[in-house]
Amino acid sequence: YFDAIEITECTDDEERNAVKKILEQSHMKVCYGAQPRLLGPKLNPNDIDEKGRKAAENTLLEAIDEAEYLGAKGIAFLAGKWEEKTKEQAYEQLLKTTRNLCDYAAKKDMMVELEVFDFDMDKAALIGPAPYAAKFAADMRTTHNNFGLLVDLSHFPTTYETSKFVIQILKPYITHLHFGNAVVKKGCQAYGDKHPRMGYPESANDVKELVEYLTVLKEENFFNSEEPLVLSMEVTLIGDEDEEIVLANTKRVLNRAWALVED
């Protein structure tokens, strides 16, 4: 069923070598998500304190090395938290970090992708919403062609945007796709950027929304059989949910949505 896999930092060399061995045998496209390297230690690639920014950059440079070792052709990361009064300064810091990452990745023929997140709800990252992400991506592409954006259906409700709006605005820069779900009603269980299963109570995304997402991607010519983009499902467990059941749920929703996308 799966042709691609997303991995992140391994705990030690033993695990890293074991993972590499499995991936080499699997005939899967390998992607590397560096987001946990930032979120766990609360590192910020747009930190206006240069020491903090450099710490975030260093772990992302390490991520590029680890990704290369594991067979991935790039990394994905996210922007950090921000304050209105220093927003422009933070933007310049993020450009500095991302350009340094792209310089390093280019030597290895690798990509650097920035995932677009909510700006005021949960992660409260500097990048998005979509128009601001487009501005950043345009600035990056003036200097680096190995930069792209990762967009996630589960984040659209958290940025008060629609699939059509996001995809059409970011079309020139999108290199990676996620889908999932979010609860954006305050006071409800799993509120914020928690990625509950599709169709979760009081949540924003189910079959209908995934059909809309896939349809606009098809209309905007994102589906290329020769060089397909990665479309990953990003779903987590809430409470005592069973991972096999939730995985089956996600497959069913994707299968049904794909069947409903008109030829």
Model region roles, listed by residue range:
Residues Y1-E62, E68, H144-N146, A248-D263:
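N-terminal pre-domain/capping segments
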Residues D3-I7, V30-Q35, I75-F77, V112-L114, ...:
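Hydrophobic faces of well-ordered beta-strands that scaffold small-molecule active sites
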Residues A4-A18, E83-K85, D120-I127, L153-E161, ...:
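Acidic-and-aromatic substrate-binding clefts and catalytic sites of carbohydrate-active enzymes
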Residues T11-V30, T59-Y69, L95-A106, T162-T175, ...:
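Short amphipathic alpha-helices and their capping/turn segments at secondary-structure boundaries
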Residues V19-L23, N46, Q89-E92, I127-P129, ...:
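Short, glycine/charged-enriched secondary-structure capping and boundary segments
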Residues L39-N44, G74-W82, G192-K194, S232-E234:
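A short small-residue
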Residues N46-G148:
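Active-site acidic/histidine proton-transfer and metal-coordination neighborhood
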Residues G71-K73, A134-G148, P157-D263:
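Histidine-acidic metal/acid-base catalytic patches
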